[in-house]
Swiss-Prot record:
Record gene name: hipB
Keyword Transcription regulation: yes
Protein name: Antitoxin HipB
CDD domains noted in UniProt: HTH_XRE (cd00093)
Domain HTH cro/C1-type: 14-67
Biological source species: Shewanella oneidensis (strain ATCC 700550 / JCM 31522 / CIP 106686 / LMG 19005 / NCIMB 14063 / MR-1)
Record text on subunit structure and interactions: Homodimer, binds DNA. Forms a HipA(2)HipB(2)-DNA complex with cognate toxin HipA; has higher affinity for the latter when HipB is prebound to DNA and HipA is phosphorylated.
Keyword Lipid metabolism included in the entry's annotation: no
DNA-binding region: 25-44
Amino acid sequence: MASPLNQQSLGLLIKERRKSAALTQDVAAMLCGVTKKTLIRVEKGEDVYISTVFKILDGLGIDIVSAQTSDTETNGWY
């Protein structure tokens, strides 16, 4: 069973996926249609609108359900 995501773990997931795609914050922000400052806030787990988080997930091609399952299985959490 997947553990629930919180703001900080979701931010880390986004940051890890961005880095694994070899994207800078500037480029990722542009692809997602947000400012670099906003992307940084999301990656830090700070408060933002949920619509902004979905915009970033979509822009980076992250499926939150499979990402959460993959992340928890990698860490050995079932």
